[in-house]
Regions:
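Hydrophobic anchor at the beta1->P-loop junction of P-loop NTPases
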Residues: 439
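Conserved lysine of the Walker
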Residues: 447
Length: 781
């Protein structure tokens, strides 16, 4: 008797207990499980990759790679693909990470936490999706099976990795936890197990995972604990299958397990079988032709079915012999579970409708409910004798990948809902190789809203500090509500930032005084202007004067005061070189002239946790100096925060305007390349993609950007972005005429379409810049 038959026959004995229903003999701590028929199996859990939003070329490449994975398994390596959708009724594993505090921000914190809880709860109505691959091989004992399974495990993980799929092997406890979840649907019963407890209690591993009861007395349904279940198989009748069939079943809001048991047919045996079928068809043709001759009609006229069978068999033989195709025997089952029988029947009906849509049929396993259920467990055991012959290509079309999820723990921030899976998107930018980010979207797309939502999430979930460079003044209301410092840099503003401020006590690789001298050199170069900039003698004189005006601070004298720009101006006038007078004359306008905005002591709190620098209402000359001074403040703040072990989130709005000045553009390249190493998390925002990409420095910035939020784009901008970022046509559809708050999120090598429907309330009013919303607020007031 073959091992397969032995395996199936064991399930025909009536189980006297719930434990006896579970078809394995022994589970070992390293994850090797012995099942009937002398097979030893191991299980891998693997993550999803982006297939649904990939380009046609990428989808073809994924299917080709998946075909290679399938072809790895030979006739001695049966394997099982398990797709388990579980409804979690316990506390969600993605918990809100915003701790309660007693401060002035309780109303905002409470509202944000409630929003986040609501979005997490809406994530597929609590459906959690898991994917497993279980493979087994025959062996005389576990000692013989262990090294062989180890090699297979390494090969399978390597094959998946080449597809970009992350996987991990499950140890014995992990596998028991999976089985416990499958036999305790609904997530009501916690899994409690430790190997050390087995000798103490005298219990077996099955005792820790078995439900209270199984009831398989009915022909078309069964009971597991308090839940109703139904086991069915997929009858594949379509001549051509769709890659959407499996995905649509798994996307349902239902608790179910889809299982594909796959047995590879030996290649020589498969070819021999097909040749035998072709010979049989040839004999049938000859018989039909003899009948035609005897009846007196054309012998070339054959029954249509016979012609079709002959053509299909010839193509199949060609595939097996020359196209790297293999033959598989597939058992495709679906086990639905629900709290009530009515809900169960509705769920089965829905799955059946999807099957019919793709010219397949879902058939109930009448009087085989027990065999169907135990075959769905991630053990590698198949008690169903219904098999369908499939080639590699037709098997690979049941592609096990849909969309990559992005749900991180710790200080992960909320970025909306996955538009494909409806799961919450939680990501931590600081875990990327480069945390640098960009927000790109046309006017009204929700670009500023998305950045402000991230900002408020950073404020509530972390202790990090935040700096906003705001050319239009849009962030001021939000920053004031967060207790931050709004600094308006303008000729008529009472706020002042001195470019001469210097912190001598920062532990840094470079001397603070040398860095300040370098900054003031570039500031003077900006002010003096000219094609050639400062001459060597002028640079020497400026450096000498900088050291003189900071002499007392450098010596650490108690009487030392922070100098002003005018002190540098006066020191330059005292120098004997004519070059010093030339520089001093250029500085005069900004010290004693009408543009003396920066010749005042700093009178704002630069140490506030949230600082917003508003650059609205500045002329061209002042704007350049203001931006240069702002950049110096950002650098100093990042250095100071890094010394304290705190990250700094920087937001640069209207980024395309800031890149127009070559000095500022080169500064941002340095930010994107160097400051990230000191805990800086910069974000650039713009609606003008053409101007952004016109900058000579944008290539360096994009090359160091691992985080990007793309919202609705104008047609010309879409074409530019598609070429620059390699966005597929399907992905472009998510930023084409999309609603506000809809778009694409790029996180490292993960691309996810997202939707953010933020509820109205105090936070919404702080974040929105839409004229109709602002008008509504004024009406309410």
């Amino acid at each position: 008797m073959s091992k397969a038959k032995k395996q199936r026959n064991t399930s025909k004995h009536r189980a006297l207990s719930a434990q006896q229903t579970i078809p394995y003999i022994a589970m070992h701590p390293d994850g090797i499980c012995q099942i009937p028929g002398g097979l030893y199996t191991k299980t891998l859990e693997y993550e999803d990759i982006n297939y649904a939003v990939a380009s046609t070329e990428d989808q073809t490449a994924i299917i080709s790679g998946w075909s290679a994975c399938l072809n790895y398994f030979d006739s001695s390596l049966p394997f099982q693909l398990s797709f388990v959708n579980r409804r979690s009724r316990n506390a969600n594993r993605y918990k809100v990470n915003i701790p309660a505090q007693e401060d002035d921000f309780n109303s905002i914190r409470g509202e944000y936490v409630e929003m986040l809880k609501g979005q997490i709860a809406k994530s597929n109505n609590g459906i959690e999706r898991y994917k497993y691959i279980t493979f087994g091989l025959p062996a005389e004992g576990v000692a013989e099976a262990r090294p062989r399974l180890g090699r297979v495990e390494a090969d399978v993980m390597g094959n998946l990795k080449r597809l970009g799929v992350q996987s991990r092997p499950l140890d014995g406890r992990d596998r028991l936890a999976v089985l416990h979840g499958q036999m305790h649907p609904g997530g009501r019963e916690p899994f409690r197990f430790a190997w050390k407890d087995i000798p103490k209690t005298g219990m077996g591993t099955k005792d820790y995972i078995a439900p209270d009861s199984f009831d398989f007395r009915q022909s078309r349904t069964f009971r597991v604990g308090q839940m109703w279940g139904a086991a069915s198989y997929l009858q594949i009748m379509a001549s051509e299958l769709s890659d959407k069939l499996l995905a649509e079943i798994l996307e349902l809001d239902a608790e179910l397990t889809v299982t594909m048991h796959i047995q590879t047919v030996d290649q020589l045996k498969a070819i021999k079988t097909i040749k035998g079928k072709i010979s049989d068809i040839g004999r049938m043709k000859a018989e039909e032709q003899k009948k035609a001759v005897r009846a007196g009609y054309d012998m070339e006229i054959l029954p249509p079915d016979l012609i079709t069978f002959s053509k299909d068999a010839a193509e199949l033989l060609s595939d097996l012999q020359s196209r790297n195709e293999r033959m598989f025997l597939l058992t495709f089952t679906v086990v639905n579970l629900a709290l009530t029988r009515q809900r169960l029947e509705n769920d089965v009906f829905t799955v059946s409708g999807i099957a019919q849509k793709y010219n397949c049929a879902l058939r109930r396993l009448d009087w085989q409910q027990e065999q169907g259920f135990v075959s769905s467990l991630a053990l590698g055991y198949n008690g169903i004798e219904i098999q369908r012959g499939m080639t590699t290509s037709s098997t690979a079309i049941f592609i096990p990948f849909m969309t990559r999820e992005l749900r991180m723990d710790g200080q992960a921030l909320y970025y909306g809902m996955n538009a494909l899976s409806n799961n919450v998107i939680m990501a931590d930018r600081k875990k990327l190789k480069s945390a640098n980010g960009m927000y790109l979207g046309s006017t009204g797309s929700g670009k500023s809203f998305a950045a402000k939502r991230e900002l408020i999430n950073v404020f509530l979930a972390t202790n990090d500090r935040i700096i906003v460079v705001d050319p239009m003044g849009e962030y001021a209301p939000l920053v004031r509500r967060l207790g931050g410092q709004v600094i308006e840099i303008a000729p008529d503003s009472p706020h002042h930032i001195s470019p001469m401020d210097l912190q001598m006590n920062i532990n840094d690789e470079d001397s603070p005084l040398s860095m300040k001298a370098d900054f003031l050199l570039s500031l003077c170069e900006l002010i003096v202007g000219g094609k050639e900039g400062l001459q060597p003698i002028e640079k020497t004189v400026i450096d000498r004067c900088v050291r003189l005006v900071y002499r007392e601070m450098a010596l650490g004298l108690e009487t030392a005061k922070t100098p002003l720009l005018q002190d540098l101006y006066e020191e330059l006038l005292r120098q004997p070189e004519p070059e010093a007078r030339r520089v001093a004359t250029a500085l005069e306008l900004y010290c004693t002239g009408s543009l003396n905005l920066f010749n005042h002591p700093t009178n704002v709190d630069l140490n506030s946790r949230v600082v917003c620098i508003v650059l609205k209402g500045l002329g061209e000359n002042l704007r350049k100096i203001a931006m240069h001074t702002t950049n110096e403040f950002v650098t100093a703040a990042v250095n100071a925060n890094h010394a304290e072990g705190v990250a700094t989130w920087c937001y640069f709005d209207e980024f395309h305007i800031l890149l127009r000045d070559p000095l500022t553009a080169s500064y941002f390249v340095a930010v994107w390349k160097m400051l990230r190493k000191k805990g800086c998390v910069p974000s650039a925002l713009t609606q003008n993609v053409k101007d952004l990409l016109a900058s000579r420095e944008i290539e360096n910035i994009l090359d160091n950007t691992d985080f990007m939020v793309l919202l609705s784009q104008a047609q010309s901008d879409r074409a530019i972005l598609a070429k620059q970022l390699g966005i597929s046509e399907h992905q472009l559809s998510y930023i084409t005429h999309s609603n506000s708050g809809e778009g694409l999120l790029f996180y490292g090598n993960v691309t996810i379409p997202f939707v953010d429907r933020f509820p109205r309330g105090e936070i919404y009013d702080l974040l929105t810049t839409r004229p109709e919303d602002l008008a509504h607020e004024r009406t309410d007031e």
